[in-house]
């Protein structure tokens, strides 16, 4: 299976948050090269061109030391043929996959998390409808700006203290 993988022009170029532990702001850009000794956990979201009705796939990967964040996301998505199983015989018709969201998967308490924790949060709070494609695929209401809404959901999950009433 061959398809083009692109990052949408409206994708967030940076991811920033403040730790409650040391009160320092963390900031990473999409073209950041991991200069740490540890893998950076990442969350990403993408959609398949001409199959947008199947929703946005929210997934997880890591960025190894000395790799670029963008490259880590690309590598993970390009290895996910099984994720397109919902297309059945149409799998060869995939021409393009667009990444529309990414973030570092570390919360305000400096704890890393995986995509399934975010999926559970989305389902528990009824923030997105689960796609018929399966548990990692979600439908964003067409009346919402999907880029802003996905970012908002992620910020709510990562830093719940900012959203307490």
Curated annotation (Swiss-Prot):
It comes from the Bacteria. The lineage of its organism: Bacteria, Bacillati, Mycoplasmatota, Mycoplasmoidales, Mycoplasmoidaceae. This is Putative type II restriction enzyme and methyltransferase RM.MpnORF109P N-terminus. Corresponds to the N-terminus of a putative G subtype type II restriction/methylase subunit. Induction: Detected after 6 and 96 hours growth, there is no change in protein levels (at protein level).
């Amino acid at each position: 299976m061959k398809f083009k993988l692109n990052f949408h022009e409206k994708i967030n170029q940076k991811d920033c948050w403040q730790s409650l532990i040391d009160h320092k702001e963390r900031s990473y850009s999409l073209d950041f090269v991991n200069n740490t000794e540890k893998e950076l956990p990442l969350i990403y979201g993408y959609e398949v061109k001409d199959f947008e009705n199947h929703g946005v796939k929210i997934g997880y990967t890591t960025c190894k030391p000395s790799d670029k964040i963008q490259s880590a996301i690309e590598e993970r998505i390009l290895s996910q043929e099984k994720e397109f199983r919902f297309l059945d015989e149409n799998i060869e018709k995939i021409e393009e996959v667009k990444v529309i969201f990414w973030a570092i998967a570390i919360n305000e308490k400096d704890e890393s998390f995986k995509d399934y924790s975010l999926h559970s949060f989305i389902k528990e709070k009824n923030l997105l409808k689960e796609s018929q494609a399966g548990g990692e695929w979600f439908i964003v209401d067409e009346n919402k700006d999907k880029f802003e809404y996905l970012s908002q959901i992620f910020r709510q999950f990562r830093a719940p203290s900012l959203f307490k009433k």
